[in-house]
């Protein structure tokens, strides 16, 4: 480990509150350290070779939010990926109702996407749509704007574009992922942040995949939980997909409540996971990075405490730098970085309080057991 990270480590016998009290300027100092460690790497254009290829240009929602070559997710290229109606420029998207009437629409691959490649990435990148009509076509490739994070525990990706929805579901299938975490709304401040890639009822077809709506549950101000059945038409196999959408996270901001956000995290963890957790907001760096940082540290803390009954050390700057070395710009703002600490602190305190209650309850139960049989008059 780089020795310069040691100064930011929170030891097992300390706490985040003590860390804040002992280092009043720690947020600014740590975030500046993160920028210093990662900003040069994000400017090296050779690190983004596939993302910058002309044929992949329209697959990027934002021209300055791109995946590193070495950590990008690759999708398989199949001969019949684009054969669905002998038209290699179109993607089939169909809506099938219960009467088996098939209402198909076709989306031109060259009709939607980024208007151009400007800066590769900057730490002050605005999560605003750079999209345009575009007049350059794309060809089949293994490229999708998505990155493996934390050694493949997560995949962080942009909100799908209309012309990348098929690629998105293909990635879900190939990576054997059954959990999708969505941290944006489809539209925010009158701007499209994510194109809709799922049906609200019945089913829709995306290329060689059918996504069937099963059910949903809405908890106001926290989440919409959806269940889908994903069918691969090429091998006639199906899988269950769990889709969790956090509905109250403002772009570039932070959730109002750490408690509400941690409830959302607990809902995600309730489902047994297969494959990487696929996380996206709009660009796949700010809100997505914040979720991954919180989720990974809270999971580490809970596991370590359950096994050893003591808290592990925490080094948030080290984690964020590692994440940014896998996808540029992860945990995009200082406020998001601060929110990580606040949410992690609350989650840790919750675990400790539960353990204290458990011990008190155990102590009480032992003291309440009579040592002899009941007395009789």
UniProtKB/Swiss-Prot annotation:
Enzyme class: hydrolase
Parts of the chain that traverse the membrane: none
Active-site residues from the entry: 281
Chain spans, region Disordered: 77-137
Enzyme Commission number: 3.1.3.48
Annotated catalysed reactions: O-phospho-L-tyrosyl-[protein] + H2O = L-tyrosyl-[protein] + phosphate
GO molecular function per UniProt: phosphatase activity; protein tyrosine phosphatase activity
UniProt keyword Hydrolase present: yes
Annotated protein name in UniProt: Tyrosine-protein phosphatase 2
Protein encoded by which gene: ptpB
